């Protein structure tokens, strides 16, 4: 009888210990909880104490699902529990809990590595244009959201370094200096111009058309043999901004090839027809062009205003470092031939030394020597914008 009573007492004690209620602090509020209560059940019965899951966000930062993010955060005795740990936890004496809102989550996404091409910045107002800073490509990671269909750039993108085109008017020291230049040849007028230059012991720069060089190779060779500078006016005098990339590069490089074949000189110097060489053209062909040479004094000799008018235009407008534009081809150039002695003699009377464009650039000293030497080369780590 006594043994039976003792057994009942022991069972009652075990039952009391195992199923008794204990105080459990939750978010600073003390609640009575039966020992062994599943934590997951306890949280659900109390609606997670007002805490809510985080939002599910798109890669672009828009809300896809207000409750589709990370679940409510549950911390026991300073340690955050995982979802599996919450499901496996039975509440016990001495536990302390904190329940808070879940954090936002980003939708599933795929990643794409993208190259960022450099842009072109072009200085204005100068007669000589050249690559002052080579561009370098950047890169970024693009996220493609699987639910939203949105795309967004990930953090940590490396920006591109822009290509910078310098543009300066030449200001040589020790002058005054001036460069005489001729476009659109060689032609039947070129020998007369060369003879005048030789007679007066001066050198000029000839911006030749590649197709004219191909059909007048002896005249092109005579330019170089006379100690003059030969450069390119492109192959066929097209408006370069209207050309697609491959056509543009061909228009430039074919002229270089024809000049080299006729004279042995591989130039990188051009004068774009109409002076039109924009950021777009530099971005497409800056690796094959050393410099684009414009002018400071336009004689308008192609309008045939008379030899004296052509000469007066030069003498009334020339300054130290000026580049003078004339033509030895592209039409009737008799007035240019007639004006040339007047120009040379007038410049000499005013103390000017007549040099080539390359010499003028070198005397100025601000443009890299590789430009003068037709040795410009794009660095291996550089990139063109297009």
Where are the regions a protein language model picked out?
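Catalytic domains of cell-wall/extracellular-matrix polysaccharide-remodeling enzymes
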Residues: 192, 238-353, 357-373
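Eukaryote-biased recognition of intrinsically disordered, low-complexity regulatory segments
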Residues: 12-31
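LysM (lysin motif) carbohydrate-binding repeats in extracellular/periplasmic proteins that recognize
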Residues: 37-77
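N-terminal pre-catalytic segment of deacetylase/amide-hydrolase enzymes
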Residues: 61-71, 76, 84-179, 188-191, ...
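Active-site beta->alpha N-cap acidic-glycine motif
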Residues: 150-239, 243, 247-251, 256-258
């Amino acid at each position: 009888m006594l043994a039976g009573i003792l057994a009942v007492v022991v069972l009652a004690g075990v039952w009391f210990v195992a199923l008794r209620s204990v105080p459990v602090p939750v978010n600073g509020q003390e609640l009575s909880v039966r020992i062994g209560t599943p934590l997951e059940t306890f949280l659900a019965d109390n609606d997670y104490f007002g805490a809510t899951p985080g939002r599910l966000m798109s890669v672009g930062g828009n809300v896809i699902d207000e409750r589709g993010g990370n679940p409510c955060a549950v911390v026991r005795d300073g340690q955050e529990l995982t979802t599996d740990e919450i499901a496996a936890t039975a509440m016990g004496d001495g536990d302390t809990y904190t329940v808070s809102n879940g954090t936002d989550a980003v939708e599933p996404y795929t990643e794409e590595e993208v190259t960022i091409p450099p842009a072109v910045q072009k200085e204005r107002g100068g007669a000589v244009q050249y690559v002052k800073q080579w561009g370098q490509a950047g890169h970024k990671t693009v996220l493609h959201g699987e639910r939203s269909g949105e795309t967004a750039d990930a953090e940590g993108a490396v920006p591109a370094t822009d290509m910078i085109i310098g543009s300066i008017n030449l200001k040589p020291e020790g002058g005054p200096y001036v460069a005489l230049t001729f476009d659109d040849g060689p032609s039947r007028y070129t020998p007369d111009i060369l003879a005048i230059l030789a007679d007066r012991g001066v050198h000029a720069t000839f911006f030749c058309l590649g197709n004219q060089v191909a059909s007048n190779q002896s005249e092109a060779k005579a330019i170089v043999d006379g100690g003059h500078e030969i450069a390119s006016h492109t192959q066929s005098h097209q408006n370069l901004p209207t050309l697609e990339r491959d056509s543009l590069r061909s228009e430039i490089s074919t002229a270089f090839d024809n000049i080299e074949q006729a004279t042995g000189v591989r130039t990188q110097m051009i004068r774009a027809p109409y002076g039109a060489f924009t950021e777009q053209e530099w971005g497409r062909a800056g690796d094959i062009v050393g410099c684009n040479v414009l002018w400071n004094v336009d004689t308008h000799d192609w309008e045939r205003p008379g030899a004296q008018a052509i000469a007066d235009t030069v003498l009334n407008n020339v300054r130290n470092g000026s580049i003078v534009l004339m033509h030895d081809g592209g039409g009737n150039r008799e007035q240019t031939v007639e004006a040339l002695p007047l120009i040379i003699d007038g410049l000499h009377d005013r103390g000017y030394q007549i040099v080539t464009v390359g010499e003028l650039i070198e005397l100025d000293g601000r443009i890299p020597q590789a430009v003068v030497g037709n040795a410009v080369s794009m660095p291996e780590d550089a990139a063109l914008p297009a």
